[in-house]
Amino acid sequence: MKLLLWACIVCVAFARKRRFPFIGEDDNDDGHPLHPSLNIPYGIRNLPPPLYYRPVNTVPSYPGNTYTDTGLPSYPWILTSPGFPYVYHIRGFPLATQLNVPPLPPRGFPFVPPSRFFSAAAAPAAPPIAAEPAAAAPLTATPVAAEPAAGAPVAAEPAAEAPVGAEPAAEAPVAAEPAAEAPVGVEPAAEEPSPAEPATAKPAAPEPHPSPSLEQANQ
């Protein structure tokens, strides 16, 4: 049993040495092994290099190259916070802040529904309504010009009453109805010729002469 326990301890110790051969770290505590090799992972926790390393310019500095400063950061994977001015900037290229969409304006009433917010924003449109009384002034001037025109027909109304006064003239024929009754009363006048029948009978006096002739004819 003791031999089995010792065998387990030795296996664990050797396995740890093979898995992490850089247990002894350098004095700077960077996590780099003292004797690195090509088949070991980078660092004990696989962390990026520290930020205080001196930046390295990757552009070759040969004699014909006059543009050696690109302005790029040495560690492009380190991003700056949004809204913070960039330390590294390419000349002739717009800033990232200029490419960003401008933020929306702050709303004065964050808890008010949009319909009420827009109606409250439309409230300043009331001053143009106050200017409408100035437009009503010409309306008051129009009745003044209409009064004389309206008065003239009023003065002409008596002329229109003249036909009303002429109605008695129309009543004159009504008064003539008795004249129409006159023919009714003329009937007695028509009876007057009846007494004149004797006057017509005067020529009829010779009638006895033809009557005998008729009698003779009858005989």
Curated annotation (Swiss-Prot):
Species of provenance: Homo sapiens
Main location per the UniProt record: secreted
Gene name, Swiss-Prot/TrEMBL: PRR27
Low complexity composition-biased segments: 155-204
Cleavable signal peptide: 1-15
Disordered, as annotated region: 155-219
Single GO cellular component term: extracellular exosome
Protein origin, superkingdom: Eukaryota
Key words of the record: Secreted, Signal
Descriptive protein name: Proline-rich protein 27
